[in-house]
């Protein structure tokens, strides 16, 4: 079964947990109580949007780490939505993610990424599998590749946090869209306002985004 066939199959599933709000993905969990939604959106902003002490990786690169973790956990909603968020954030910054690079990321690869991003992907994927498998050698390799302590801390926290989000979505069997295109509108809102802004609230940016560069996110500069 191809990934798209599996995506469509999941979109057609009936939730096995009753009483869920009729919204897709993590939105179903967020609407179970007002405070739960507030804190889940706030955590996403802390991990993916807000300044993090000592971190040098961009918002787009943080979204790519969330995409890789979600792909490893086989959570199609989170994988597709954060891939769309990464593309929207990078486009807003005048950058892009080549499809081949994103496909590699979703299949567990690091092709096309520079050594620092590849090392951070390795850290996030290791923590996703089993946190205690992360070694001092993994951390030292990331530092040697140019990662800061803040970058490494974020890679660990994103792996842990998005494993939680992934299990909320799939444990509740929340609805998944049959096509990644379904996430583009919300992704454009998040690129401008972050996660705490309600859906449909984005306003156009006050100035035009910079002209797109051809350099992809975290690309190897050889």
Predicted regions and their residues:
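Hydrophobic alpha-helical segments
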Residues: 1-222
């Amino acid at each position: 079964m191809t990934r798209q066939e599996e995506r469509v199959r999941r979109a057609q599933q009936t939730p096995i947990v009753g009483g869920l709000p009729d919204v897709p993905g993590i939105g179903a969990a967020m609407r179970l109580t007002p405070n739960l939604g507030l804190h889940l959106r706030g955590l996403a902003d802390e991990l993916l949007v807000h300044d993090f002490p000592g971190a040098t990786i961009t918002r787009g690169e943080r979204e790519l780490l969330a995409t890789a973790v979600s792909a490893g956990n086989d959570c199609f909603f989170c994988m597709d939505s954060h891939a769309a968020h990464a593309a929207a954030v990078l486009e807003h910054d005048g950058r892009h993610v080549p499809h081949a690079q994103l496909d590699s990321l979703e299949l567990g690869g690091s092709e096309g990424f520079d050594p620092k991003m590849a090392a951070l992907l390795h850290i996030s994927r290791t923590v996703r599998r089993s946190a205690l498998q992360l070694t001092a050698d993994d951390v030292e390799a990331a530092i040697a590749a140019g990662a800061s302590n803040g970058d490494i801390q974020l890679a660990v926290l994103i792996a842990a946090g998005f494993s939680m989000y992934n299990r909320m979505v799939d444990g509740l069997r929340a609805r998944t869209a049959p096509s990644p295109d379904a996430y583009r509108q919300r992704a454009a809102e998040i690129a401008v306002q972050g996660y705490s802004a309600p859906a449909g609230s984005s306003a156009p940016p006050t100035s035009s985004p910079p002209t797109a560069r051809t350099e992809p996110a975290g690309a190897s500069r050889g």
